[in-house]
């Protein structure tokens, strides 16, 4: 069902954010938006090559292709992917970065599982880039804040609704 798709959730939350969070704030100029989008695509390519193409694949070879080995490779690569986002502490609020790390870790587990299931890194590159573009739209389209700072400003009801959806 389309409602169960992560892309539906991304689109739904993006439209809500664009429509209601900042109605009086002007958008960034189109060339800057397109540059951001290209940047997000390139980040998706680079992170997938490193975290799924190299790290997850190496872990899978180490732990084996039995069910337990696949799970272990997914979990370890996901935790490493989440930890890599700790570098955002240099410029963003700690709570937002913590939430971003938790999200990135769970996303890393999911993307590793998709990569192992499909055997196609381009599938995860597409999904990762689409999610990064959606995050950019939510956090930076208006040129006012980062994604981590956006998450820091969320009230409890918004964070709980995301948690319920993920469960």
Please report, for each region that a protein language model flagged, where it lies by residue.
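Hydrophobic alpha-helical segments embedded in the membrane of multi-pass proteins
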Residues: 100-114
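Hydrophobic residues within alpha-helical transmembrane segments
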Residues: 38, 76-83, 98, 102, ...
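C-terminal membrane module of polytopic membrane proteins
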Residues: 129-167
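Membrane-interface helix/loop boundary segments of multi-pass membrane proteins
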Residues: 46-76, 93, 116-120
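Active-site His/Glu-centered metal-binding helix of metallohydrolases
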Residues: 45-50, 54-55, 59, 83, ...
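Juxtamembrane helix-loop-helix connectors linking adjacent transmembrane helices
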Residues: 3-50, 56-66, 149-150
């Amino acid at each position: 069902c389309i409602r169960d798709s992560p892309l539906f959730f991304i689109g739904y939350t993006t439209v809500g954010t664009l429509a209601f969070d900042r109605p009086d704030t002007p958008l960034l100029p189109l060339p800057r938006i397109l540059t951001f989008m290209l940047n997000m695509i390139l980040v998706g390519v680079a992170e997938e090559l490193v975290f799924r193409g190299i790290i997850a694949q190496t872990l899978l070879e180490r732990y084996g292709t039995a069910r337990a080995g696949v799970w272990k490779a997914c979990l370890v690569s996901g935790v490493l992917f989440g930890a890599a986002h700790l570098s955002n502490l240099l410029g963003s609020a700690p709570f937002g970065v913590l939430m971003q790390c938790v999200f990135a870790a769970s996303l890393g587990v999911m993307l590793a599982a998709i990569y192992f299931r499909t055997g196609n890194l381009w599938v995860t590159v597409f999904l990762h880039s689409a999610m990064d573009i959606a995050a950019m739209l939510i956090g930076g389209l208006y040129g006012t804040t980062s994604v981590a700072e956006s998450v820091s400003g969320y009230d409890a009801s918004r964070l709980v609704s995301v948690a319920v959806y993920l469960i």
